[in-house]
Amino acid sequence: MRIAILGRPNVGKSSLFNRLCRRSLAIVNSQEGTTRDRLYGEIRAWDSIIHVIDTGGVDQESTDRFQKQIHQQALAAAEEASVLLLVVDIRCGITKQDEELAKRLLPLKKPLILVMNKADSQQDLQRIHEFYGLGISDMIATSASHDKHIDLLLERIRQIAQIPVPSVEEQDVVQEDELPSEEAAISLHAFADETLFENESLSQEEASFLEELVAQTATPAPVDRPLKVALIGHPNVGKSSIINALLKEERCITDNSPGTTRDNIDVAYTHNNKEYVFIDTAGLRKTKSIKNSVEWMSSSRTEKAISRTDICLLVIDATQQLSYQDKRILSMIARYKKPHVILVNKWDLMFGVRMEHYVQDLRKMDPYIGQAHILCISAKQRRNLLQIFSAIDDIYTIATTKLSTSLVNKVLASAMQRHHPQVINGKRLRIYYAIHKTTTPFTFLLFINSNSLLTKPYELYLKNTLKAAFNLYRVPFDLEYKAKPARKSN
């Protein structure tokens, strides 16, 4: 079931959306027009998921150049949803915009709840009777900012959705056999023939240390959910246009003015039976360019989108040089260790430029670009868009592939036989064995005799060996180490 939240500007729609979804997904600000696109969230309750759509404020008398598109997005959400919430400001009484919206929504013959928001006091509640004139019989007074009567609204939504209330026995009870079990401890003996130095026996102390560490190491199973893909870039590079072109519909408002997108917009899409969630983000600006709190929150939300996504699509403008913002975003993606693809948009404007030469020059402009997958596309002409799905799938397959312990150890054993670690104070680095610890982020864990024997050049050598062996050129990964505790002196 889908619920659409509609209303004129600044009546608290985004605050209500955040309360229902229990997350700050929509930017909340007293400035009118803060929300422009359709923003999607979820109510997770009663063992069910209800999808919620937040829309921009509809004001047909506004001179805002985005108002026509906001109006279209709101009406599209009303058509898409099965339940409608018309939000009004109880303190203002009925306005002309409220009346116009009610007239548009009532003929849709869908369950319609009038949410009289901002009922912060008992005095506000005395104005409920003023709204009978809208002709909507289902009415609930709320205060989203103070979390008042949201439970009543949720209960009404549950009734409309005909979701049964779980029995007391079913609520908040976790059966013992349903508790997540830790993965079985990896037996040291199972890998006795896979240690990197097969001909060297372990001392009893080393064996005990190794067995204890292995038993504590578990790798979580990959989550079965849609793949999250965030489109990142500085303002006006065409992020929203790319999503609209991929989906073949106007899901995100576009304009030539930088900063059109303010919220992070999650758009679900299925391609070749695979589920994706595209996250359209606000453009990341230079700090000096951020003029108000709404733009600051948008930039902050861009970083949050990077942190929660599976893959980043960095969108750059083919007609412009790689900017400071682009490099800042690249470093941010690297800091969060996210696989990424670089989309060079507006390629239709690059007359007489050879693509391979452009890509070669681009790789030299920033070390974080490295061997990243680069696609030259045109959202306007829908050129090379399907290659985006192929690039996403390829890189995600590599990034989520669980490597066998046997294979990882054989690769490292071969590397150490080719180039032995240097001797330091009469001792040499010893790797007992290694495992592929996690896929998100991609991490190897090496059990070694001492951190002091691992030099930076040799660590880089090991990392490059793993990168080449497992084709990790486009997947950021880390090496972690567990060293044997130093012997206690008597």
Swiss-Prot record:
Q: Describe the family membership recorded for this protein in Swiss-Prot or TrEMBL.
A: Belongs to the TRAFAC class TrmE-Era-EngA-EngB-Septin-like GTPase superfamily. EngA (Der) GTPase family.
Q: What is this protein called?
A: GTPase Der
Task: Please indicate if the UniProt record lists GTP-binding as a keyword.
Answer: yes
Describe its assembly. Answer: Associates with the 50S ribosomal subunit.
Q: Any coiled-coil ranges, and where?
A: none
Return the InterPro entries for the record.
Answer: G_ENGA, GTP-bd, GTPase_Der, KH_dom-like, KH_dom-like_a/b, P-loop_NTPase, Small_GTP-bd
Role this protein plays: GTPase that plays an essential role in the late steps of ribosome biogenesis.
Does the record carry Transport as a key word?
A: no
Q: Which GO terms describe its molecular function?
A: GTP binding; ribosome binding
Residues holding GTP 2: 233-240, 280-284, 345-348
Pfam families, alphabetically?
A: KH_dom-like (PF14714), MMR_HSR1 (PF01926)
The transmembrane residues are none
Residue intervals of the KH-like domain: 401-485
Annotated residues that bind GTP 1 are located at: 7-14, 54-58, 117-120
Which keywords has UniProt assigned to this entry? GTP-binding, Nucleotide-binding, Repeat, Ribosome biogenesis
Q: Which lineage?
A: Bacteria, Pseudomonadati, Chlamydiota, Chlamydiia, Chlamydiales
